[in-house]
């Protein structure tokens, strides 16, 4: 008989507070196996892995938590701490100021939240449209018309954001390196030229896949190929 998620989470939280981090991880992962996920759950798993000094796994689950709650300060702080513990300190490619502003706005919410915002704004648009068509008051009709237009444009904009984030999440997948030392190759072949070396815990962006090889890009813009088995996808 399956144990309810609430009981598993309660048990895992208790084990964590008692310093039984491996047991806590086991029970948290059972909750995920049951089909449940939340930023808090992933955050707790990340903290548990951090306590046993498994930084790659900690970063993986902090990143999963961040994908759901991108503005959570605790998640961001712990993720930064975990990243400071790994071997590689990769400098990110500088962004133009308007690109940085756009990315900040774009990443304010998860894809689900942007979708909910779109639905809410569209419902408001329909309400103003209904008042416009049903009202006989000239000034009210004019007000509802312009508000309706503005809200319609906003709903199109937020729908575009939601769709773009969803498309990005499907086409481009981020992953964490789980191999202690990994040599990145120039092509999807173990006999190809060595390009550079990265280590466990580094986040990579998967941009292509050929057989059992991923083409990846790291934060400084460097691109190369690695075996699929070397990473776990976020």
Where do the model's predicted regions map?
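Boundary regions of SH3-family modules and the immediately adjacent low-complexity/disordered segments
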Residues: 55, 142-179, 186-189, 193, ...
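Membrane-embedded alpha-helical segments of integral membrane proteins
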Residues: 93-133
């Amino acid at each position: 008989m399956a144990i309810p998620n609430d009981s598993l989470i309660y048990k895992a939280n208790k084990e964590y507070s008692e310093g039984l981090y491996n047991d806590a991880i086991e029970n948290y992962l059972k909750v995920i196996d049951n089909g449940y996920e939340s930023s808090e759950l992933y955050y707790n798993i990340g903290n548990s892995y951090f306590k046993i000094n498994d930084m790659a796994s900690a970063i993986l689950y902090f990143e999963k938590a961040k994908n759901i709650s991108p503005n959570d300060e605790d998640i961001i702080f712990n993720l930064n701490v975990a990243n400071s513990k790994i071997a590689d300190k990769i400098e990110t490619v500088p962004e133009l100021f308007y690109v940085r502003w756009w990315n900040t706005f774009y990443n304010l919410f998860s894809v689900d939240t942007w979708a909910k915002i779109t639905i809410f704004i569209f419902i408001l648009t329909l309400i103003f449209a209904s008042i416009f068509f049903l009202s006989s008051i000239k000034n009210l009709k004019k007000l509802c018309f312009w508000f309706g237009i503005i809200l319609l444009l906003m709903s199109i904009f937020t729908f575009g954001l939601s769709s773009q984030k969803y498309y990005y999440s499907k086409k481009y997948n981020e992953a964490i390196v789980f191999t202690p030392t990994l040599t990145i190759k120039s092509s999807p072949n173990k006999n190809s030229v060595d390009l550079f070396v990265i280590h466990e815990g580094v986040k990579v962006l998967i941009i292509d896949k050929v057989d059992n090889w991923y083409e990846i890009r790291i934060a400084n813009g460097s691109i190369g190929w690695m075996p699929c088995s070397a990473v776990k996808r976020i």
